Amino acid sequence: MTPQDLKNVMSSGLLSFPITDFHDNGDFNAKGYAERLEWLAPFGASALFAAGGTGEYFSLTASEYPQIIQTAVNTCRGKVPIIAGAGGPTRFAIECAQAAEKAGAHGILLMPHYMTEASQEGLAAHVEAVCKSVNFGVIIYNRGITRYTPETVARLCERNPNLVGFKDGVGDIEGMASMFLAMGDRLAYLGGLPTAEVYAAAYKALGTPVYSSAVFNFIPKTAMRFYEAVKNDDQATQHQLLKDFFMPYLKIRNRSAGYAVSIIKAGAKIVGHPAGPVRAPLADLQAEEIEMLAELIRKVEPV
């Protein structure tokens, strides 16, 4: 897949980030992960992001990462494109990007670097080093301490033709509007706030109709139904699902830091597709919270 092909894929449809399966002892469970992807692939996502934030990229080892990407590519070949997460320190991000390209992934999402703040010049050097280390497409992730200005992105796009996407996880409406107006159709734009459905209609109004759904991991039919409602400006369906599921879901998710990932694994277990525990420093949901989530799931997608 060429970078332009990746941009085209990222320009329409619903995206998702599968959780990563672990055994009870925390080791990567390749068989469980393959079975998960086989289950999710037919539901209609435009692409799946392996080893992304929801896939606990931040807790993976250098030896596990290629296994995870290779499992995803092998399982989904001919079914749905696989985009790999890559990030952290520049040299490690390059190692991951090159490993993903070797495994046959169709591109990478370049996630935030680790811990330290950086100037726009430093961010640009980081992105350019990764872009020039691979031939396939790169999507940058605007989130946390990694925040790009339109001017920085414009310079990067001039120098790196394989930079084809911009994912926003900040939620700065003015900043996102400025980016879209500055870059136009040079990039594909993705909404990437946690529980992106809550913000999907607003992002669509800004020219960003594509977003990634975490709940696709356990209620894929409902996730697709909500996406279609946004796509078709069906406000009645959007509001009903926000009322019945997404807003109460946020109350559970917001009970503890790190639950944005933990709640997804809990949901997968509830619907019969368990992925094992989250890795520290994350913590699994409490029994009471799991029952609260199960009740919400029964309202929209009975098990």
Swiss-Prot record:
It catalyses: 5-dehydro-4-deoxy-D-glucarate + H(+) = 2,5-dioxopentanoate + CO2 + H2O. InterPro entries: Aldolase_TIM (IPR013785), DapA-like (IPR002220), Dehydro-deoxyglucarate_dehyd (IPR017655). It is an enzyme of class 4 (lyase). One of its GO terms (molecular function) is 5-dehydro-4-deoxyglucarate dehydratase activity. One of its GO terms (biological process) is D-glucarate catabolic process. CDD domains: KDGDH. It comes from the Bacteria. Gene3D superfamilies: Aldolase class I (3.20.20.70). Keywords: Lyase. Pathway: Carbohydrate acid metabolism; D-glucarate degradation; 2,5-dioxopentanoate from D-glucarate: step 2/2. Its EC number is 4.2.1.41. Belongs to the DapA family. PANTHER family: 5-DEHYDRO-4-DEOXYGLUCARATE DEHYDRATASE 2-RELATED (PTHR12128:SF19), DIHYDRODIPICOLINATE SYNTHASE (PTHR12128). HAMAP family: KDGDH (MF_00694). This is Probable 5-dehydro-4-deoxyglucarate dehydratase.
